[in-house]
Amino acid sequence: MAKETYVRTKPHVNIGTIGHVDHGKTTLTAAISKVLAEKQGVDATDFAEIDNAPEEKERGITINTSHIEYETEKRHYAHIDAPGHADYVKNMITGAAQMDGAILVVAATDGPMPQTREHILLARQVGVDYLVVFLNKTDLVDDEELVELVEMEVRELLSEYDFPGDDIPVLKGSALKALEGDPEQVKVIEELMDTVDSYIPEPARETDKPFLMPVEDVFTITGRGTVASGRVDRGVLTTGTEIEIVGLKDEVQKTTVTGIEMFRKTLEEAQAGDNIGALLRGVDRSNIERGQVLAKPGSIKTHKKFKAEVYVLTKEEGGRHTPFFTNYRPQFYFHTTDVTGVVELPAGVEMVMPGDQVTFEIELISPVAIEQGLKFTVREGGHTVGAGTVTDIED
């Protein structure tokens, strides 16, 4: 069967549901899908399909996630829901699903629970800056004051992690009742999605950001010069533009792109997502290597020392069998290459066990083009043992 073409008529936004286990994330996801589908007369994705999340591999890590899509009048959404807590942690840290915003689900019957806090912290660390709150299961709480108390607790918790707790929109309802078709609760879901439409801003398009391309390969074309190939990470590149070659060396080289090719055809302009070869003026083959990046001048710098939020794989996931300690020296895989680094654990953390999620400091042996929010994997002897996100640059 021929694949449907994706017609781009509305702005596209990636969102997800986060929150404690059994607070109703998947039920809410199914309810949103159903309510919006009925409004538009299309098929909904049902609970069982979402709950039975397929395994995906991202950076060598297996994650169960469900991606569903739906539309409001204003936007097209891709919605991600992960069944298990470990799946969420892995998802957010590896960037398997880059979320522009999220719906935080809190059961009014329980209030904020440990994973509620953990997901809020993760959202803060990996750059999910916009949250909308859905207080679920309010039909099971007789006392209105209790619901208000839970709302206050959630707002305080959000403020604690530098979210605007007082201003974040909070909606109250029952995802299950909405899924069963209760008209009053269907209205709440419609209201929730109107709020998501207006509160979670449209993401800056990748093409509007400064040009960046990690170098995957370098070769020479006789008589023409050196070509660096790779996938454009963000921004656009036009022939004749001045760029910088950044990373792995202390000094930055400037050069001009004299030609761009894609699939052996000449291209005037390359955009985010394109796999290209860029012909670089006056650059010797020995002066550029895999793992460096081509970038808009001044847009990215090299660093050696940074803090990161890291998920350490379990033995079952192919990770280490034993804990590691301060001064652990694995390889950190950034962009397209491994660089050795030394781990310094925070005060009070003696060791890190497989399966842990932890923040620590890393000092690399060579400078790499990095910035806040960059994803990387931790490797040892060619095997992935962890995945991380840069949270703070220290040098």
From Swiss-Prot:
<keyword id="KW-0648">Protein biosynthesis</keyword>
<comment type="subunit">
    <text>Monomer.</text>
</comment>
<keyword id="KW-0547">Nucleotide-binding</keyword>
<dbReference type="InterPro" id="IPR050055">
    <property type="entry name" value="EF-Tu_GTPase"/>
</dbReference>
<dbReference type="Pfam" id="PF00009">
    <property type="entry name" value="GTP_EFTU"/>
</dbReference>
<dbReference type="GO" id="GO:0003746">
    <property type="term" value="F:translation elongation factor activity"/>
</dbReference>
<dbReference type="InterPro" id="IPR009000">
    <property type="entry name" value="Transl_B-barrel_sf"/>
</dbReference>
<dbReference type="InterPro" id="IPR000795">
    <property type="entry name" value="T_Tr_GTP-bd_dom"/>
</dbReference>
<dbReference type="InterPro" id="IPR027417">
    <property type="entry name" value="P-loop_NTPase"/>
</dbReference>
<protein>
    <recommendedName>
        <fullName>Elongation factor Tu</fullName>
        <ecNumber>3.6.5.3</ecNumber>
    </recommendedName>
</protein>
<keyword id="KW-0378">Hydrolase</keyword>
<dbReference type="InterPro" id="IPR031157">
    <property type="entry name" value="G_TR_CS"/>
</dbReference>
<keyword id="KW-0963">Cytoplasm</keyword>
<feature type="region of interest" description="G3">
    <location>
        <begin position="81"/>
        <end position="84"/>
    </location>
</feature>
<feature type="region of interest" description="G5">
    <location>
        <begin position="174"/>
        <end position="176"/>
    </location>
</feature>
<dbReference type="GO" id="GO:0005525">
    <property type="term" value="F:GTP binding"/>
</dbReference>
<feature type="binding site">
    <location>
        <begin position="81"/>
        <end position="85"/>
    </location>
    <ligand>
        <name>GTP</name>
    </ligand>
</feature>
<dbReference type="InterPro" id="IPR004161">
    <property type="entry name" value="EFTu-like_2"/>
</dbReference>
<keyword id="KW-0342">GTP-binding</keyword>
<dbReference type="InterPro" id="IPR004541">
    <property type="entry name" value="Transl_elong_EFTu/EF1A_bac/org"/>
</dbReference>
<dbReference type="InterPro" id="IPR005225">
    <property type="entry name" value="Small_GTP-bd"/>
</dbReference>
<comment type="similarity">
    <text>Belongs to the TRAFAC class translation factor GTPase superfamily. Classic translation factor GTPase family. EF-Tu/EF-1A subfamily.</text>
</comment>
<dbReference type="InterPro" id="IPR009001">
    <property type="entry name" value="Transl_elong_EF1A/Init_IF2_C"/>
</dbReference>
<feature type="binding site">
    <location>
        <position position="26"/>
    </location>
    <ligand>
        <name>Mg(2+)</name>
    </ligand>
</feature>
<dbReference type="InterPro" id="IPR004160">
    <property type="entry name" value="Transl_elong_EFTu/EF1A_C"/>
</dbReference>
<feature type="region of interest" description="G4">
    <location>
        <begin position="136"/>
        <end position="139"/>
    </location>
</feature>
<comment type="function">
    <text>GTP hydrolase that promotes the GTP-dependent binding of aminoacyl-tRNA to the A-site of ribosomes during protein biosynthesis.</text>
</comment>
<dbReference type="Pfam" id="PF03143">
    <property type="entry name" value="GTP_EFTU_D3"/>
</dbReference>
<feature type="binding site">
    <location>
        <begin position="19"/>
        <end position="26"/>
    </location>
    <ligand>
        <name>GTP</name>
    </ligand>
</feature>
<dbReference type="GO" id="GO:0005829">
    <property type="term" value="C:cytosol"/>
</dbReference>
<keyword id="KW-0479">Metal-binding</keyword>
<dbReference type="Pfam" id="PF03144">
    <property type="entry name" value="GTP_EFTU_D2"/>
</dbReference>
<dbReference type="GO" id="GO:0003924">
    <property type="term" value="F:GTPase activity"/>
</dbReference>
<feature type="binding site">
    <location>
        <begin position="136"/>
        <end position="139"/>
    </location>
    <ligand>
        <name>GTP</name>
    </ligand>
</feature>
<feature type="region of interest" description="G1">
    <location>
        <begin position="19"/>
        <end position="26"/>
    </location>
</feature>
<feature type="domain" description="tr-type G">
    <location>
        <begin position="10"/>
        <end position="204"/>
    </location>
</feature>
<dbReference type="InterPro" id="IPR033720">
    <property type="entry name" value="EFTU_2"/>
</dbReference>
<keyword id="KW-0460">Magnesium</keyword>
<dbReference type="InterPro" id="IPR041709">
    <property type="entry name" value="EF-Tu_GTP-bd"/>
</dbReference>
<keyword id="KW-0251">Elongation factor</keyword>
<feature type="region of interest" description="G2">
    <location>
        <begin position="60"/>
        <end position="64"/>
    </location>
</feature>
